[in-house]
């Protein structure tokens, strides 16, 4: 039975770099929107200065954004050198995006505008063995209901677990849910709502949310988002671009082996990281070692993890041992991310991150032990501080950016 627990390839430019090359028009268009997200009101001249472009280039970009209804003029403002200029602002509330997160046990639907403001958020739980068509029908109904309530929605983004094969529109493997690999999400949703519909891998969605909306030191060159929840995954943004690979399935950190003689994973590999530090694994360890922390009967993995974290904070030694084991494996994952991608920052998110105050010291200890000083001293490792689930946030951000890359589709929606 479904239960309601609700409540009411993306590019971001580095802070001062743009390009006058026509091949980068879409990137520059996204960058202008990003500047207006940060500044609220800004002149063409100030945008040109911040991006390092000519004012003529910015004028052309802004003209397209105004035609799309994304940007409007707000009258005279004080610009550089105290000169008066025409101000620009985002028409945020007139351009809303639905973000959808599909996960094991639940899906979530949220409404955002292009400035990142959230208007609504609802979560629907379902048993992991629930029939796929029942879950898909519930997702579609919730999106239709949301469209009825919010009339300014211009696009929909869906984040799904990976490895997601973007050209085929399906997930290659959904651990714990093997029957879902036959579901073609693209075919199921693309023509359902009469809105542009985009699908993104959940790790990539989290990376996008952190890149666009995370409170991190700027500029960043390479960001790694490390998703540790019902599954384990990651998303990498380097130089402003998502690292996707030929099929869109790059950076599957959860299926990197940490024990070549370990248990066989559903993906076919042995000793996958996901088998050692995901929420289901933590729940399993808790049942074996600290059952007194758990409720009798069925309990969601994330709720069980929270119970273990609370017990550990209270000094329960067995709970602390469970947390240390999970934290060490997250640390091994960070070691792999650092050696593979040399990021400025690793952001750990999803349900396990709720124990960040306990986990982070353990993770950093492992990294310090296993990474050379020249690398580990240059990477920042932190827990996501976003108030909205990064995966849900990123699903909406991905849809926003895709529309900015294709103005003709955007204008067709607005007509």
Where are these regions (language model features)?
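ATP-binding/phosphotransfer module of carbohydrate and carboxylate kinases, centering on a glycine-rich
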Residues: 1-153, 193, 261, 269, ...
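Short glycine-aspartate micro-motif
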Residues: 97-101, 153-157, 223-227, 233-235
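Glycine-rich phosphate-binding loop and adjoining helix at the ATP-binding site
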Residues: 118-144, 148-222, 358-369
